[in-house]
């Protein structure tokens, strides 16, 4: 299977998800996944997820949820994904700084071995004024991460698809990658948190 689910929260994010790493990996194996990712605002799920993936011969991808600084009033919701041992070390250094909002200067120092995905999940991303305003910020993050930079987008309806046309054009003109990035918080509908 060529699609990789990256934005899956686990039950280690109390009140955010019901997904247990072992069950998630087992189900992914049944569906033919070869690579699988998790995200969170802590690292607690990493060991059990790594063990479950190793047992099922699935490549594990680890992401960390951050709030990314913006020159606008609304910061960006984003994720740093570990690509290498150096990336893991750099992520630990970023976490050690205990910043609520991560800025460009900190990322300049510790971006090696990491990928950045900005989640384009706010209606503002579909408005021309906002896209023009954030263009400078986005250019700086893209220059820093280069091919390891992307936008994550979730389209849940035909209306979402129509609304996102302007955003797609914005990304196409600037050659920004867009990834399917739906949030997964449960494996079965009956497990959904209210």
What are these regions (language model features)?
Residues 1-194:
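Phosphodiester-processing cores and adjacent nucleic acid-binding clamps
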């Amino acid at each position: 299977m060529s699609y990789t689910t990256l934005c899956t929260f686990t039950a280690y994010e109390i009140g955010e998800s019901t997904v247990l790493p072992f069950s998630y990996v087992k189900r992914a194996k049944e569906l033919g996944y070869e690579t699988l990712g998790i995200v969170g605002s802590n690292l607690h799920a990493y060991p059990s997820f790594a063990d479950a993936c190793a047992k099922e011969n699935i490549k594990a991808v680890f992401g960390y949820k951050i709030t990314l600084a913006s020159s606008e009033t609304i910061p960006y919701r984003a994720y740093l994904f570990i690509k290498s041992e150096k990336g893991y070390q750099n992520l630990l250094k970023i976490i050690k700084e205990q910043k609520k909002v991560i800025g460009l200067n900190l990322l300049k120092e510790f971006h090696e071995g990491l990928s950045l995905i900005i989640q384009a999940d706010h209606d503002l991303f579909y408005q021309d004024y906002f896209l023009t305003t954030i263009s400078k910020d986005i250019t700086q993050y893209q220059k820093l991460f280069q091919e390891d930079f992307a936008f994550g987008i979730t389209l849940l309806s035909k209306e979402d698809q129509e609304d996102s046309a302007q955003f797609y054009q914005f990304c196409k003109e600037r050659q920004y990658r867009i990834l399917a990035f739906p949030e997964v918080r449960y494996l079965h509908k009956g497990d959904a948190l209210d």
